[in-house]
Amino acid sequence: IDIDNSINSGQVFLWEKQGVDWYGINGQDILKIDKNGMIKSIRNRKINFFRKDDDIEEIIKSISKDKIVKKAVKEYEGLRIFKQDPFQCMISFIISSNSNIQKIKSSLEKITRKFGTKVKIEGKEFFVFPKPEKIAKASIDQIKTCGVGYRASFIKEAAQMVVLKKIDFEYLKKCDYQEAKKNICRIPGIGNKVADCIMLFSLN
């Protein structure tokens, strides 16, 4: 697995390299990847962030029927799709609409600092991603201070839908592609591309 390329590919935004190690926020957890590519959860949770159960050879064989994809697979060997926290992933890609990686990263960092909980590990301070309830209760003006502009109302409504179980990530993981997409596209601010990103990066 090419860790650096995978982290910098635009799937995740709340990761930073400190020395030779990567630290990343994944929902209510902090993940650490060392120089050998070993990953651990600071909360000692069982994680499958690298999707090690996937049959990579079979997936590559299947998608390489397309010539452009085949060339990309060869050029970016070692690139992997991560399995992210669904709520964090959803908010990240609502913010991603009409934006760029630096702006997305900046807004998400502000959201975690404003609404998340501070944790200390290995002498370092981090903020875990806020729970849906925290964002659902925030005012649109409070969310706007995080640099998300017109997306503030989308973020609040998305969080409210999760709290009210109108969006149930565990249910969506069991749905087929069309059914999951239909459900996710009910959230304001989510169209085809954003829905596909959320499904690919967090809902299997």
Question: Model-flagged regions — what are they?
Answer:
Residues 1-204:
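HhH-family (HhH-GPD) DNA N-glycosylase catalytic core used in base-excision repair
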